[in-house]
Swiss-Prot record:
Protein name: Regulatory factor X-associated protein
Native organism: Homo sapiens
Residue stretches spanning the membrane: none
GO biological process: positive regulation of MHC class II biosynthetic process; positive regulation of transcription by RNA polymerase II; regulation of transcription by RNA polymerase II
Gene from which the chain derives: RFXAP
Motif extent (Nuclear localization signal): 163-178
Tissue and organ expression note: Ubiquitous.
Amino acid sequence: MEAQGVAEGAGPGAASGVPHPAALAPAAAPTLAPASVAAAASQFTLLVMQPCAGQDEAAAPGGSVGAGKPVRYLCEGAGDGEEEAGEDEADLLDTSDPPGGGESAASLEDLEDEETHSGGEGSSGGARRRGSGGGSMSKTCTYEGCSETTSQVAKQRKPWMCKKHRNKMYKDKYKKKKSDQALNCGGTASTGSAGNVKLEESADNILSIVKQRTGSFGDRPARPTLLEQVLNQKRLSLLRSPEVVQFLQKQQQLLNQQVLEQRQQQFPGTSM
């Protein structure tokens, strides 16, 4: 393509009267023909290697103003051709869709339309729900004697109870459950060991009495109080008094005589 542009660019230069080295070759001497051919070849090679170079750079190897004009035309033509080729390629890229590409683009657009439509329906449905929720009837507490009302109920069909009475109901159920468990446990224990309960109670009473008198098992006896100590001292002093001693001796003698009389009655032949 660039070589053809060079050939076409050389045409106008020849028409304008500027002599070309290739045109002068037949009129010149045979010795000058190789030099002119070499100069033309060098000019062509430079134009091919540097198609978009400036006017001065392209005219420097040729050394003439007439040779610079086709170079300018060649650069401009090459630039325009490249731009047109780039536009054609862009058009080809834009128009050359893969098979089914149009369908995919259309399907994407349809999906977007469906999403927007569904979003609109969802928003309208949410608005309807909010409207229905806002217009819901208020409910009253089902506990007897309570007049508390509310409009914030999750399930309209179920009965509603205020927090205070709901907690009270839960507590009552818990207490009832515990009492039932205690009664069941007590009933089974009483039916299984009715006789053992009495024995345990009597044993507990005896143990409590013994502990009160002597303290706990394994320990020393409980220390008597001050009143008990005073009473014990008075008893000892009375027992040691002479009157009490004489009285006790007389009583002992009487007992001994009674015992002897009983023995004589049982065994009349015996004598002490």
